[in-house]
Amino acid sequence: MKKYVLDLKVVSVEALSDKHVLIKLTDEKPLPEILPGQFVEVRVDHSPTTMLRRPISINFVDRENNQLWLLVAMVGDGTRQLGQLKEGDVLNCMLPLGNGFTMPTGKSQKYLLVGGGVGVAPLLYFGKLIKDFGAEVTFLLGARKDTDLLELDEFAKIGKVCITTEDGSAGEVGFVTNHSVLENEKFDMISTCGPKPMMVSVARFAKKAGVECEVSLENKMACGVGACLCCVEKTTEGNQCVCKDGPVINIKKLTWEI
């Protein structure tokens, strides 16, 4: 796919928690084609410690309003600076990058999208496209506590939402792989994004259940185009750059011990 470097205008910055913001961006021209699971590399201005662009998952593409949504966890100088953006500011973005999730091929297919923490970000757009295609989508979202759950109202507009929290403050207590939906329902595809230990557990469940599974890897990235080799992941096809060959990879290609 063709890549673009665009100066996108900030429409709004909404605080979703004390450490997460939702940034909505727009452009004068229609946004380019974007696949679910792809990401952007954003340039962070006014941060003396942030020389490299920051990779951010594409949370949603609102074609009706020509908006691109980015869900940002403010964990360092660069992302905290992004949280200070205001309406009318300009954010330089390189996009779309990487490969996306596999779309359903039949309307009878049932997809389970599993997200943990800010890893829920790419699942919103993916779920919307699955719904628009006519297939069935269920979300399984996990967090440490209820205040860490993000965009629940948006997910509920698309499909069934199942929740786990480690402290039991919302949904079922425990990790996502402990949720009863995994015992009570059958799925044709599981797609997941979040902390690696969570994705390993989800991949292990999928392999045991004989269900196709894709994971969206969150390796440390710099260039975003496969040049610097800092995001390399070992696969059955050799070392691959997560930014270029991923971030979405079928678990059959991974060398994880599952």
Predicted regions and their residues:
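Structural signal for conserved beta-strand scaffold positions within catalytic alpha/beta enzyme cores
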Residues: 12, 60, 163-165, 215, ...
